[in-house]
Amino acid sequence: MPAVSRPLPPLTALAPPELEWRADDISDAPYASAYGDVYFSRHDGRAETGHVFVEGNRLPERFAAWRETRAFVIGETGFGTGLNMLCAWACFERHAPAEARLHLVSTEKYPLPRDALARALAIWPDMAARAGVLLDQWPEPVGGVHRLWLSSRVVLDLHFGDAAERLSRLDGRVDAWFLDGFSPAKNPDMWQPELFAAMAQVSRPGATFATFTCAGVVKRGLRDAGFTWRKTPGFGRKREMLCGEIAAPPDDRRRASTPWFTPPRARPARHVVVIGAGLAGTSVAAALARRGVAVTLLERDAPGAGASGNRQGALYVKLAAETNPQSRVYLAGLLYTRRWLTALDPEQRLWQDCGVLQLAPGDKEATRQQRFLAHHALPERVLHGVDAATASQAAGTPLDAPGLDYPQAGWVRPDRLCQQLAASPGITQRRGEAHDLDFDADADAWRIALTDGSTLTADHVVVATAHEAPRFTPLAGLPLKPIRGQLTHVPVPADAPSLARVVCAGGYVAPAMEGVLSLGATFAPGDTDTAVRTTDHARNLDEFTATLPAFAEALRAAGVTLDPAACEGRASLRAASPDKSPYAGPVPVREAWLDDYAVLGADARRVPSTAGRHHPGLWVSAAHGSRGLASAPLCAEVIASRLCDEPLPLERELIDHLHPGRRLIADIIRGNATRGNATLSTSSPNDDAQPSPTTTETP
């Protein structure tokens, strides 16, 4: 039967290592007390890295000869101080062609605190520039994948957690391995058969490895996993080390228990058309252009004209009390978006990391938040609970309710962000509306028919048109529901009281920007009218005054008019999936899935071996709902990474959770799937078939 997902652990901060600082031949160096071992050679750690890992994998010659369009991928067990990865980066820049790209993947169970990392890397002043880039993006110690762009050509994916477990969930293939970590005698838990099997599973044919140790457990583990090894001279006092390769690793693409999620094989990506220039589309376009792909961005209006055209949007997420895939995706997305925005706009012209307070004004939400805090233990810099007094101090106004504080979250200008992304080098903007898509098998290309009669051709097409995606024939049946949301804009004078945080409850209010206070937003599933309504302004203002009564009264005292008839605003449509998670990935061939997996409707235990069939080069990013600022940039990386044959920025099961075919396979199993172009019902058993009455929802 379809695989049962492994239980997801709580969202917690990883423990830091127990460190001592001991003098060596160069300076004071970190020493792992729990393992009784050093992080790098006391004599010359950088020289050891060069000898063992860089030369052991023949990186200078391989980089110099690299001509493939995909990135060269290095995998590492044990990031430690990052010395190995920084040396690989330096070697790549010295030897690789200008158009080559490098992708680094490293695991770490006990991430160093940032100040300890800085102290360790300060031993080598000539590495300060690269170390500074790493330190500026150093992630919080949260288990999972953290993607860092070290340069325009170099990406680092940090997988925080146990090495074997993290590699078993890696979605990607590796060209060269740095098999590092504390010695097998002092850290036997890492050097287990599961580690070597996971390495083999995600190795490309001919992948190499190098390691400092010749321990028997390592030689046996490598051999049993399919690697061949040989002894070569070691570094310094170590007489020998191991190098080797794996000629024929297993096919990592195929999902044995969920074959429908088998990723499509890579195809050339000379030209990609992205349809839709909201945040989903512009994020994908920019991610592809960053990788050197020629992109045409097709939009019937200006970039950011739809639901992404709001003046301000809250950058935060609402995490479930119990761990689920959706919460893990959104948490990873929130952390990625913050790093991404920091690199994109360090002056914060497009965003502010002022923090977000998610209040609990009623017993139900207060109970839910208490359950969350009891189950999870994230770093305080990411999320922590606050009482009403602490929340009041953080917000800069009296509050009556406790809540959750996201100190690194904030607000973003989605309209300006879309415009900046659309103007990225490598993107050609095209004004027009796509009528339909058709794959020309003879030309091995997509033809995009425009309403003006013209046609575009492309190797790949990414559809990012929110609830309108199913109007394209290959996406007919993709369950998406339009949701109307209206924001209210209240003019405020420069000397009016101000908020220090975005405050969310039933609705939200952001700190005033350019003399306007933005609050909302209404939530009306199934309503597609975008005309601004005074009644919705009234609803937003009622929610605002109920959530922030003292602040509302202070505004009135300052002469601010809170009259719905005098307010301006904006209404737009966002899209949601039935399970409230985004779609990001390849588009399944619906009729093929109905045929290939029909047996599941009679017996879910009879899983066919047939790999899922997808439309070649067709992708979708949609259903970002009211959390698109946290999900769209990371989903763009998911699509760009898969399209460019790179390791993905999420665990394998979370990639599958985002798959656009997840509802289709669920309906096949339940016997609810339909043939033809009929759109699946987007209602859950408890949903009303008619458009819901307007309510308010935090963005």
Swiss-Prot record:
GO CC terms in record: cytoplasm
Region (FAD-dependent cmnm(5)s(2)U34 oxidoreductase): 275-699
Region (Disordered): 675-699
Any Gene Ontology biological process: tRNA wobble base modification
Pfam families documented for this protein: DAO, Methyltransf_30
Main localization, broad class: cytoplasm
Cofactor(s) named in the record: FAD
Tree of life domain: Bacteria
Protein keywords: Cytoplasm, FAD, Flavoprotein, Methyltransferase, Multifunctional enzyme, Oxidoreductase, S-adenosyl-L-methionine, Transferase, tRNA processing
Chain spans, region tRNA (mnm(5)s(2)U34)-methyltransferase: 1-247
Catalytic activity line of the entry: 5-aminomethyl-2-thiouridine(34) in tRNA + S-adenosyl-L-methionine = 5-methylaminomethyl-2-thiouridine(34) in tRNA + S-adenosyl-L-homocysteine + H(+)
Molecular function via GO: flavin adenine dinucleotide binding; oxidoreductase activity, acting on the CH-NH group of donors; tRNA (5-methylaminomethyl-2-thiouridylate)(34)-methyltransferase activity
Documented EC number(s): 2.1.1.61, 1.5.-.-
Subcellular location: Cytoplasm
Record InterPro entries: FAD-dep_OxRdtase (IPR006076), FAD/NAD-bd_sf (IPR036188), MnmC-like_methylTransf (IPR008471), SAM-dependent_MTases_sf (IPR029063), tRNA_MAMT_biosynth_bifunc_MnmC (IPR023032), tRNA_MNMC2 (IPR047785), tRNA_S-uridine_synth_MnmC_C (IPR017610)
Family to which the UniProt record says this protein belongs: In the N-terminal section; belongs to the methyltransferase superfamily. tRNA (mnm(5)s(2)U34)-methyltransferase family. In the C-terminal section; belongs to the DAO family.
NCBIfam families from the UniProt entry: MnmC_Cterm (TIGR03197), PRK01747.1-2 (NF002481), tRNA_MNMC2 (NF033855)
Role noted for this protein: Catalyzes the last two steps in the biosynthesis of 5-methylaminomethyl-2-thiouridine (mnm(5)s(2)U) at the wobble position (U34) in tRNA. Catalyzes the FAD-dependent demodification of cmnm(5)s(2)U34 to nm(5)s(2)U34, followed by the transfer of a methyl group from S-adenosyl-L-methionine to nm(5)s(2)U34, to form mnm(5)s(2)U34.
Name of this chain's protein: tRNA 5-methylaminomethyl-2-thiouridine biosynthesis bifunctional protein MnmC
Annotated organism of origin: Chromohalobacter salexigens (strain ATCC BAA-138 / DSM 3043 / CIP 106854 / NCIMB 13768 / 1H11)
